Design a protein with these regions (language model features):
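NAD(P)H-binding glycine-rich loop region in Rossmannoid oxidoreductase-like domains
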Residues: 39, 64, 69-117
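Amphipathic terminal alpha-helices
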Residues: 2-21, 303-334
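Mid/C-terminal beta-alpha module of Rossmann-like enzyme folds, strongest
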Residues: 214, 221, 234-289, 331-332
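N-terminal Rossmann-fold cofactor-binding loop
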Residues: 58-63
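Catalytic helix-loop patch of NAD(P)-dependent Rossmann-fold dehydrogenases
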Residues: 112-116, 120-121, 142, 147-189
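N-terminal Rossmann NAD(P)H-binding glycine-rich loop of SDR-like oxidoreductase domains
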Residues: 29-46
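Conserved Rossmann-fold NAD(P)-dependent oxidoreductase catalytic core, especially the SDR/UDP-sugar
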Residues: 27, 96-99, 104, 122-164
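NAD(P)-dependent short-chain dehydrogenase/reductase
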Residues: 162-164, 170-230, 266
Length: 334
């Protein structure tokens, strides 16, 4: 599979996505569209919507190739630093907003940037798009670590996570909630755990280490994952679920997956003996996404399919985005 074929797969809308978006009125704007998921989500929205409904993708666009590719697929791109209030004020109106901006890696070294990106920036955006349906990308890291026996954290669990990054993500949610209360903005908090693209993600991290003969740390002993195409579809479909007070939705796969088991599976598929380091801790970051399955149906790509495709990608020298997830972090430091 080529990168072009992979992007087509990740941006392929489901029938449900097409039906959902076509029932909603107005244009759609993706804020923070230049990250790992943004380009394929914007392309999926473009593929799902009629031609007369515009899709905007807003980012600083450090990569010009990403911008050119989006334009080639009918997405209107806008270069903008979302921390600049005047620039945000000049963005086009849209009835539907997918907010994907945020900062994670490097929090330990520059916490002030993380707090600016995850708490100040949301205030600027929420004020600008106060009447739009808004899906806010969040993370399962806002929860406390939990046991595998619990089945994962649920949407109404108390937020008591480890680490400064996680608290900045709670701040993002609180800011959007404040503006939802003040303005009646229909909002959904999209708490996502580990989207999988063959070029990055937990599965790529584990598979590449097994392939290269590097140790796999199993201290964070269990994880949840979901195919990025399914996560994109669920995010777009969640626009129809946005409400006031804001709705919270955990989004990930059904399985609570052993990292040791993953390493063994990749060892079998790649004909390598995995090197295991560490010992599984009693607690891990795990989400219970049963509500998303009830509301949005099943995923289109199974765990087995993701594992097989990732092994093939790594074995055949597929490119990497060079962005490890650092899922192994058990103290919340990134």
């Amino acid at each position: 599979m080529s990168p072009l074929e992979l992007d087509e797969w990740l941006s392929r809308p489901t029938d449900r996505t097409i039906e959902t978006l076509r029932k909603l009125d107005g244009d759609l704007i993706v804020l923070g569209a230049g990250g790992k998921m943004g380009p394929t989500l914007a392309r999926m929205a473009r593929r799902a919507l009629p031609a007369d409904r515009r899709v905007f993708a807003v980012s600083r666009y450090s990569s010009s190739s990403a911008r050119v590719d989006l334009e080639a697929h009918g997405v209107q791109t806008i270069s903008c630093d979302l921390l600049h209030r005047e620039a945000v004020a000049n963005l086009p109106d849209a009835a539907n907003v997918v907010y994907m901006a945020g900062h994670k890696f490097g929090t330990s070294d520059a916490p002030e940037l993380t707090w600016m990106m995850n708490s100040v920036l949301p205030a600027i955006v929420a004020e600008r798009y106060s009447v739009a349906r808004t899906v806010v990308f969040s993370t399962g890291c806002v929860y406390a670590l939990t046991s595998t026996a619990s089945g994962g954290s649920k949407e109404d669990d108390v937020l008591a996570p480890p680490g400064e990054y996680a608290y900045s993500c709670i701040a993002r949610e609180r800011v959007f909630t404040h503006f939802a209360k003040s303005c009646g903005t229909p909002t959904l908090m999209f708490r996502l755990n580990y989207a999988i693209d063959l070029r990055y993600g937990v599965l790529y991290d584990v598979a590449s280490k097994v392939w290269q003969g590097k140790p796999v740390d199993v201290t964070m002993g269990h994880v949840n994952v979901i195919w990025q195409g399914d996560a994109n579809a669920r995010a777009l479909e969640s626009l129809a679920l946005a409400q006031y007070p804001p709705k919270i939705l955990n989004v990930t796969g059904r399985e609570c997956i052993s990292v040791r088991w993953l390493a063994e599976q990749f060892g079998r598929l790649l004909a390598r003996t995995p090197i295991i380091t560490g010992q599984e801790a009693e607690l891990a970051w795990l989400n219970n996404a049963s509500q998303s399955f009830e509301l949005l149906g099943d995923v289109t790509v199974s765990l087995e399919e993701m594992i097989t495709a990732t092994a093939d990608w790594v074995r055949n020298g597929g490119v990497s985005l060079g962005k490890p997830t650092h899922f192994e972090s058990h103290d919340g430091k990134f």
